[in-house]
Curated annotation (Swiss-Prot):
Role noted for this protein: Core component of nucleosome. Nucleosomes wrap and compact DNA into chromatin, limiting DNA accessibility to the cellular machineries which require DNA as a template. Histones thereby play a central role in transcription regulation, DNA repair, DNA replication and chromosomal stability. DNA accessibility is regulated via a complex set of post-translational modifications of histones, also called histone code, and nucleosome remodeling.
Entry keywords, A to Z: Acetylation, Chromosome, DNA-binding, Isopeptide bond, Nucleosome core, Nucleus, Ubl conjugation
Entry protein name: Histone H2B.3
Post-translational note: The N-terminus is blocked.
Amino acid sequence: MAPKKDEKPATAEAGAEAPAKAEAKPKAEKAGKKAKKEPAKKAAKEPKGDGEKKDKKKKKSAVETYKLYIYKVLKQVHPDTGISSKAMSIMNSFINDIFEKVATEASKLSRYNKKPTVTSREIQTAVRLVLPGELAKHAVSEGTKAVTKFTSG
């Protein structure tokens, strides 16, 4: 409100203080810009609010699934074989269940060892506990290979 008080005396005294008035306007504009920046931020938040509605729609359509990866693996193993949507849904549920079991077991292991971080070692042990026999061995070897590839670049 101080810039408005400065402007009123400047408008009352016309003539010699016209340059001061011109200088007062940029200051007022700067103050106005500061004030405008805040509503601009709010305005920027408002489209995000609208965007959130769009994001909600996107979230509905972009639910995390493994369908694409299941399909890619299927085509690597059997290029001429297809999969029904029901079978794909079952496979996706299966992977989500296994992932949840491994994550839960790894979390328990880190708590037992009083460590705040779940490392690859906890994941490896959890895989050995959750998956049976030969499947666990293959999963551990593939996981080790993937971690090595990731860390090497």
